[in-house]
Amino acid sequence: MDYKTSGVDIEAGREFVSEIKQAVEGTHTSNVIEGIGGFGGLFRIPIDSFKKPVLVSGTDGVGTKLELAQSKNFHFEVGIDLVAMCINDIITSGAKPLFFLDYIATGKLDKKQLLRVVQGISHGCGENNCSLLGGETAEMPGFYSKNKYDLAGFCVGIVDEDKLINGKKVSENDLIIALKSNGVHSNGFSLVRKIIQNNNQIEKEFEKVSHLSFYDELLKPTKIYNNVIGQILSEDIEIKAMSHITGGGIPENLPRCIPSDFIPYINTNSWEIPILFEFLKKIGSIPEKDFWNTFNLGVGFCLIIDKQFKDRIYNICKDHDIDSWEIGKIVRKDNATISKFLPEILT
């Protein structure tokens, strides 16, 4: 028995690398020293632009959104999701992304399918001046089923140590600015999938109340906030802290970016929760606490700032076609009049 008979096609793997080469190398900046194919990606760190350069790294996946995306042929979109989940994490430190690595594991290499994934990854990287420096595609018969794949991403960025954003400057009455999400992004899909399994008319029901395609809305790629954040920082606007709203929603992610003696007080009436979330809540009978602790509810990213910068940030976000608004403020934990992060039912 040869290797191909056992389920691993080496030649197909070589052909796949050849087919993705154009998309991958299209993301390369002048700091990439060699193209794909080596044992390690080589990247020249632009240290001349920094006094005390600090590398910031992040790794993530797309979770069980992949299950639905694969069944509906949203392969390009999950490639973008993979990049977004990593870049959105590292930019919370004020970092600029430098390069990205991907890992794709599958039961059987479907070149057409995975080419779309890599094209999505390349698109996400290219739009954010982030080089797709390398990756691994593993064909693993018997471990993954024939038509399934899993994704993991790894991103490295850079920031000057003196410009690190770590929440230490957060103070009482700072404003919390929300940046709108594209939708569900890449979290909560284990719950979403169970709701879909229990409601075989869910597409028709959603289209009836929204006049929108259910899966087009549900599987929109995660918004990448790098370009808008980069412009804000380039205009000498001080951001004291940032939070990427992912699994755990606002209640779990926002407190992570501020000192422990403060809490974020959120005005839950400051925005209208998008119809997709309200629909899922109703049709899935999701309890209020789970609703807030699972989904982003229309808020993909948060900034904590001094009030003097609010209008300038709104204008920059508008230039990037991103809705933004004041969602709350920072208060001390010992504040006797405001003792809850969110309404009591949520805490």
From Swiss-Prot:
Recorded protein name is: Phosphoribosylformylglycinamidine cyclo-ligase
The UniProt entry, under Pfam families, shows:
AIRS (PF00586), AIRS_C (PF02769)
The catalytic activity of this protein is classed by the Enzyme Commission as 6.3.3.1
Write out the pathway annotation from the protein's UniProt entry: Purine metabolism; IMP biosynthesis via de novo pathway; 5-amino-1-(5-phospho-D-ribosyl)imidazole from N(2)-formyl-N(1)-(5-phospho-D-ribosyl)glycinamide: step 2/2
- Cystine connections: none
Database matches in InterPro entries = PurM-like_C_dom (IPR010918), PurM-like_C_sf (IPR036676), PurM-like_N (IPR016188), PurM-like_N_sf (IPR036921), PurM_cligase (IPR004733)
Q: Which GO terms describe its molecular function?
A: ATP binding; phosphoribosylamine-glycine ligase activity; phosphoribosylformylglycinamidine cyclo-ligase activity
Q: Quote the catalytic activity from the record.
A: 2-formamido-N(1)-(5-O-phospho-beta-D-ribosyl)acetamidine + ATP = 5-amino-1-(5-phospho-beta-D-ribosyl)imidazole + ADP + phosphate + H(+)
Instruction: Print the organism lineage.
Output: Bacteria, Bacillati, Cyanobacteriota, Cyanophyceae, Synechococcales
